[in-house]
């Protein structure tokens, strides 16, 4: 048995900010995917995934039935029979590994599910987001529900604020454009929960809160607007500012060995780096006006282009 594929995602803008009502923009990333599967001879990895699913089933039994109900016994017996999530999405990389799993489970086992084929009103999108937030919180404490939403619908999503989200049309790519958004592999697995904990601790300080509002959220919102309008010039100006703010105020989320590289981008204007997801490792997002220059400048690292300007 093998179920339909669910894809990874990239939160282009809005990491951390969306916890505090900044704008955000999330796009599907079809390079990685996952599907529910059962094998005759499962690998170690499949068995590990199966164990995790079995704990997930217990968690889903306790979810508020007013919110969502599942074919829970069917799910439990499928898991009992060895079902696992077969995924190429790297875990701890900020591209939504648990989100795709949540989307796959909802798709297959939820009652009265909202589907991508119907007219997706704001209410329906929000309801899905709340359901997914509840489901995904099993994996890392506090989830916004956005990753599974993106994976489930496989369309770009614009977050205007916590309770105002909509599907978005993003400008068509210029396939031979020199400008690019890319992923840089840090080679380190990042853990989401401790990073979110650091952020929440910082939020207790007045100075950090006002920096978030006056700098981080301001530039994040501007980046989202620029990207959707296709205003590349302004986008790079704002991305540079955002990159600076992150370097100055989100240092623990940037792996130590990337601090200099981060600074170099800002100083040379060859590329600007930002967090991809919660940081701490995994992928780092990069924006450049000239991908060849960026590749040269970052030649010791593996870059994957995800969007061309």
Predicted regions and their residues:
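ATP-binding N-lobe of GHMP and related small-molecule kinases
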Residues: 1-95, 107-123, 272-275, 280, ...
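Glycine-rich, charge-dense phosphate/pyrophosphate-binding loop(s)
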Residues: 15, 19, 217-309
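Buried hydrophobic packing segments
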Residues: 101-113, 149, 284
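Alpha/beta catalytic cores of group-transfer enzymes, especially the acyltransferase/condensing modules
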Residues: 123-169
């Amino acid at each position: 048995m093998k179920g339909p594929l669910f894809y990874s995602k990239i939160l282009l803008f809005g990491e951390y900010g969306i916890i505090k009502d900044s704008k955000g923009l999330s796009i599907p990333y079809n390079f990685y995917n996952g599907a529910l599967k059962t094998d005759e001879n499962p690998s170690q990895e499949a068995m590990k995934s199966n164990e995790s699913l079995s704990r997930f089933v217990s968690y889903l039994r306790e979810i508020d039935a007013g919110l969502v109900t599942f074919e829970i016994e069917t799910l439990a017996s499928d898991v009992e029979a060895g079902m696992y999530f077969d995924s190429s999405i790297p875990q701890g990389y900020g591209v939504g590994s648990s989100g795709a799993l949540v989307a796959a489970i909802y798709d297959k086992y939820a009652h009265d599910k909202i589907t991508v084929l119907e007219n997706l009103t704001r209410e329906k999108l929000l309801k899905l987001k709340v359901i997914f937030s509840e489901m995904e919180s099993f994996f890392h404490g506090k989830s916004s529900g956005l990753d599974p939403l993106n994976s489930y619908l496989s369309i770009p999503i614009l977050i205007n604020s916590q309770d105002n989200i909509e599907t978005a049309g993003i400008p068509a790519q210029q396939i031979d454009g020199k400008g690019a958004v890319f992923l840089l592999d840090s080679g380190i697995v990042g853990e989401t929960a401790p990073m979110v904990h650091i952020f929440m601790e910082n939020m207790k300080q007045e100075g950090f809160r006002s920096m978030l509002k006056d700098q981080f959220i301001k530039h994040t919102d501007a980046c989202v607007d620029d990207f959707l309008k296709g205003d590349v010039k302004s986008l790079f100006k704002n991305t540079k500012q955002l990159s600076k703010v992150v370097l100055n105020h989100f240092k623990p989320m940037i792996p130590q060995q990337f601090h200099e590289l981060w600074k170099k981008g800002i100083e040379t204007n060859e590329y600007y780096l930002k967090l991809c997801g919660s940081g701490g490792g995994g992928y780092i997002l990069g924006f450049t006006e000239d991908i060849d220059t960026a590749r040269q400048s970052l030649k010791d690292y593996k870059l994957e282009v995800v969007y061309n300007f």
